[in-house]
Amino acid sequence: MSRYTTIPYLEKINFVERYRALCHKFNNYDTCLDSYEAETYKEVLDEFGLLYEYDKREKFFRSVYALTSGHEFILTLGTLKGRVELFIEIGYEGRYMIPSGRLDTIPEEMGYEFDRKKYNLPKFSSVEDLREILYTLMGIIKDLEQAIVEGAGAET
């Protein structure tokens, strides 16, 4: 197994099914808010203790941090109207691990069937929906971090 692939870690945390379930639950484009809700993003990111920068002009949040295993995580949350767009990049030893990028593209890069028209991006109809989406996504990210740290420890 290549040390520059995220696939075993994503499979370990059941990423594809978790992301599909999230998109299925929050999939009503007709009722999604015509709002960015940047303050809610800030509150949730603060609750998870992430340092981040907000690009008001481009409307995205970015957080860059390192794990104890030496992996660097770059999370970018696009604040689209009524939709949550998360990009993830993971660096290790000066290289980016694959697959990476926008979460809805990762299942196909892993070799799984994933209907992006049906399960594109989670959509929120209320601030409560947005909070639940962000908490679910951060739970996935935290589980991925843990799987990577545990996997890196097993390599030594």
Predicted features by range, described:
Residues 74-77:
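Heme-based O2/NO sensor domains and their adjacent alpha-helical segments
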Residues 43:
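Surface-exposed charge patches
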Residues 46-59:
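Short secondary-structure junctions
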Residues 1-16, 21-40, 63-70, 82-156:
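Intrinsically disordered, low-complexity regulatory regions enriched in serine/threonine/proline
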Residues 49-50, 69-71:
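Short alpha-helix boundary/capping elements
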